Amino acid sequence: MHILVVSVNYRTAPVEFREKLTFQAAEIERAMTTLQNQKSVLENVIVSTCNRTEIYAVVDQLHTGRYYIKKFLADWFQLEIEEVAPYLTIFEQDGAIDHLFRVTCGLDSMVVGETQILGQIKDSFLEAQQVKATGTIFNELFKQVITLAKRAHSETTIGESAMSVSYAAVELGKKIFGELTDCHVLILGAGKMGELALQNLYGSGARKVTVMNRTLSKAEVMAEKYMGHAKSLSELQCALLEADILISSTGASEYVITKEMMTKVEKMRSGRPLFMVDIAVPRDIDPAIDELEGSFLYDIDDLQGVVEANRAERLKEAEKIQFMIEEEIVLFKTWLSTLGVVPLISALRDKALAIQSETMVSLERKIPNLSDREKKVISKHTKSIINQLLKDPILVAKEIAAEEGASEKLALFAKIFDLETEEVESRAEEVEHKRVWTPSVPSL
């Protein structure tokens, strides 16, 4: 089995391509179910955010797995593989594990150290579990990754100097306008990104805030928290007349603000400039609007300059987290190396249980007058004896599994206990396709 990551991210693909390969939240579970049925794919988790679409997979063959994941992406978004391939980055084995840790800890984010990605990874993993797209390997790996990411943010100061993309958008506005106290700010979208932007705007002194959303009630709830006003998107054109700063993140599949709409609005703004930041993927604002004289449009890729301001400080903390990641990878690989011994241990326990069961049958035949309580006591104690006898051999088997040349030693182990090869292979197949995480083999 192999671990594989196929990634489209802000480092390798411009926003106009990333928005073509963005999974809508409502289709993620269906996408993972579809991918799970692809040849070679044993487990998968799909993560899709404004800056990346990534497929994490356990595959039985690397070459076949790579091909069918690329094909899945192309088919899902109705593109040719040749169109998609140039923008893909592929990580394998140790590189794939390291990438997942770095992404979840915020080290691979446009804004190094941001915490939003941790929640997004966790949500994607839980969705994958719900549709049974994860199994033994990913259930353990993602558990370790999420735990480490939380520890990294609590044990370092990377979160103190890190910024979200929403914060970067606000910082850009402050560079242009200075104080935001007198600026009329318009927020399009009442989701997480919109609220993060509003939090940062409020913290920077903005008080004239309007929140707009397709569902007015959501806009009202968010606006009330920050003493702003809420309006329906049907009033968008009027709101654009009043705004000085616009930050948009609606998650709509088509442009919310078109060049035609903005051309009409500009004529009524009496030459007042409008600073627009589009942090949505797919984009909310028609990029052609930047051609208009009074509209200054920035998209998510333009925020990189603002992000760089605090980068040096964050990178110092990132080095500490990378060291933590490397330690955690060693622990995961040790666990992974012992996974192959589970079928052997299971076969050994099954053989011991069969002997105990045969002994109980023989005992009941020789002493037919045993009460039910006496049978239970005898059964419990014979199982206890077996568990104590097997404890040390099982620990040794696990240690051997983590060593070089383990296969020959484990073969000798199987021979000593007269374990049938077919039985062990059958157990291995069960483990390989298991869909529920089991951290250890249960005792008898």
UniProtKB/Swiss-Prot annotation:
<dbReference type="InterPro" id="IPR036291">
    <property type="entry name" value="NAD(P)-bd_dom_sf"/>
</dbReference>
<comment type="similarity">
    <text>Belongs to the glutamyl-tRNA reductase family.</text>
</comment>
<comment type="pathway">
    <text>Porphyrin-containing compound metabolism; protoporphyrin-IX biosynthesis; 5-aminolevulinate from L-glutamyl-tRNA(Glu): step 1/2.</text>
</comment>
<feature type="binding site">
    <location>
        <position position="109"/>
    </location>
    <ligand>
        <name>substrate</name>
    </ligand>
</feature>
<dbReference type="Pfam" id="PF05201">
    <property type="entry name" value="GlutR_N"/>
</dbReference>
<feature type="binding site">
    <location>
        <position position="120"/>
    </location>
    <ligand>
        <name>substrate</name>
    </ligand>
</feature>
<keyword id="KW-0627">Porphyrin biosynthesis</keyword>
<dbReference type="InterPro" id="IPR006151">
    <property type="entry name" value="Shikm_DH/Glu-tRNA_Rdtase"/>
</dbReference>
<dbReference type="InterPro" id="IPR000343">
    <property type="entry name" value="4pyrrol_synth_GluRdtase"/>
</dbReference>
<dbReference type="InterPro" id="IPR036453">
    <property type="entry name" value="GluRdtase_dimer_dom_sf"/>
</dbReference>
<dbReference type="GO" id="GO:0008883">
    <property type="term" value="F:glutamyl-tRNA reductase activity"/>
</dbReference>
<dbReference type="Pfam" id="PF00745">
    <property type="entry name" value="GlutR_dimer"/>
</dbReference>
<dbReference type="InterPro" id="IPR036343">
    <property type="entry name" value="GluRdtase_N_sf"/>
</dbReference>
<dbReference type="Pfam" id="PF01488">
    <property type="entry name" value="Shikimate_DH"/>
</dbReference>
<comment type="subunit">
    <text>Homodimer.</text>
</comment>
<protein>
    <recommendedName>
        <fullName>Glutamyl-tRNA reductase</fullName>
        <ecNumber>1.2.1.70</ecNumber>
    </recommendedName>
</protein>
<dbReference type="GO" id="GO:0006782">
    <property type="term" value="P:protoporphyrinogen IX biosynthetic process"/>
</dbReference>
<feature type="active site" description="Nucleophile">
    <location>
        <position position="50"/>
    </location>
</feature>
<dbReference type="GO" id="GO:0050661">
    <property type="term" value="F:NADP binding"/>
</dbReference>
<dbReference type="InterPro" id="IPR018214">
    <property type="entry name" value="GluRdtase_CS"/>
</dbReference>
<keyword id="KW-0560">Oxidoreductase</keyword>
<dbReference type="InterPro" id="IPR015896">
    <property type="entry name" value="4pyrrol_synth_GluRdtase_dimer"/>
</dbReference>
<feature type="site" description="Important for activity">
    <location>
        <position position="99"/>
    </location>
</feature>
<comment type="function">
    <text>Catalyzes the NADPH-dependent reduction of glutamyl-tRNA(Glu) to glutamate 1-semialdehyde (GSA).</text>
</comment>
<dbReference type="InterPro" id="IPR015895">
    <property type="entry name" value="4pyrrol_synth_GluRdtase_N"/>
</dbReference>
<feature type="binding site">
    <location>
        <begin position="189"/>
        <end position="194"/>
    </location>
    <ligand>
        <name>NADP(+)</name>
    </ligand>
</feature>
<feature type="binding site">
    <location>
        <begin position="114"/>
        <end position="116"/>
    </location>
    <ligand>
        <name>substrate</name>
    </ligand>
</feature>
<feature type="binding site">
    <location>
        <begin position="49"/>
        <end position="52"/>
    </location>
    <ligand>
        <name>substrate</name>
    </ligand>
</feature>
<keyword id="KW-0521">NADP</keyword>
